[in-house]
Amino acid sequence: MSSNNLVAKIAQPYASALLDLANEKKAIEQISQDMKLIKDILLQSGKLKYFLANPLKTIEAKKQVIAATFGDQISENTLSFLMVLVDRKRISMLDVIAGKYLELAYAMESLTIANISTSIALNSDQENLLIDKIKAMTSAKEVKLVISVDPELIGGFTIQIGSKVIDTSIRGQLKQMASHLDVAAM
């Protein structure tokens, strides 16, 4: 089992527990916004992610940093959940837990998340066309695009929906051609 699968398996019950709490407190939307914010901050701050994953840092130090970083930006429920993660030494998985929570919350709302990587920025017409195609593909009522620009794709785009990846990029086609040439050379 790869380490990513192991982390995802460990993260799942925490994400489910947070969703149960959010549902019980009627705060799914608020906690979803909190989790999006946390994911964005962790994505932007490698130092914070490294600090939280560092086993040499004390639980108290991690709690202080979390309170200082997120305290006034997230709900009390979410902050309490983060403190539980610190106590249980699972705070290093925060980005994965947040992602799993969002997947579960969106599935509950019948919302599909599509991670799109493009070589250039998409205009609104292209985004709407992609949303329509993804709705037809997945039978989802709502589709949310998470778009990132990756010039290394050279051209085209990749779409990731859950574990399914559709790669129409030139980089992907070049890799596929190289793979076929390697096989043919043997």
UniProtKB/Swiss-Prot annotation:
Pfam families per the UniProt record, alphabetical: OSCP (PF00213)
PROSITE patterns (UniProt xref): ATPASE_DELTA
Mode of membrane association: Peripheral membrane protein
Keyword line: ATP synthesis, CF(1), Chloroplast, Hydrogen ion transport, Ion transport, Membrane, Plastid, Thylakoid, Transport
Main location: plastid
GO cellular component: chloroplast thylakoid membrane; proton-transporting ATP synthase complex
The keyword Ion transport is assigned to this record: yes
Keyword presence, Transmembrane helix: no
Localization per Swiss-Prot or TrEMBL: Plastid, Chloroplast thylakoid membrane
InterPro entries, per the entry: ATP_synth_OSCP/delta_N_sf, ATPase_OSCP/d_CS, ATPase_OSCP/dsu
Gene Ontology MF annotations: proton-transporting ATP synthase activity, rotational mechanism
Chain ranges passing through the membrane: none
Subunit structure: F-type ATPases have 2 components, F(1) - the catalytic core - and F(0) - the membrane proton channel. F(1) has five subunits: alpha(3), beta(3), gamma(1), delta(1), epsilon(1). CF(0) has four main subunits: a(1), b(1), b'(1) and c(10-14). The alpha and beta chains form an alternating ring which encloses part of the gamma chain. F(1) is attached to F(0) by a central stalk formed by the gamma and epsilon chains, while a peripheral stalk is formed by the delta, b and b' chains.
Entry function: F(1)F(0) ATP synthase produces ATP from ADP in the presence of a proton or sodium gradient. F-type ATPases consist of two structural domains, F(1) containing the extramembraneous catalytic core and F(0) containing the membrane proton channel, linked together by a central stalk and a peripheral stalk. During catalysis, ATP synthesis in the catalytic domain of F(1) is coupled via a rotary mechanism of the central stalk subunits to proton translocation.
Stated family: Belongs to the ATPase delta chain family.
UniProt xrefs under PANTHER family: ATP SYNTHASE DELTA CHAIN (PTHR11910)
HAMAP family: ATP_synth_delta_bact (MF_01416)
The protein's name: ATP synthase subunit delta, chloroplastic
Taxonomic source organism: Porphyra purpurea (Red seaweed)
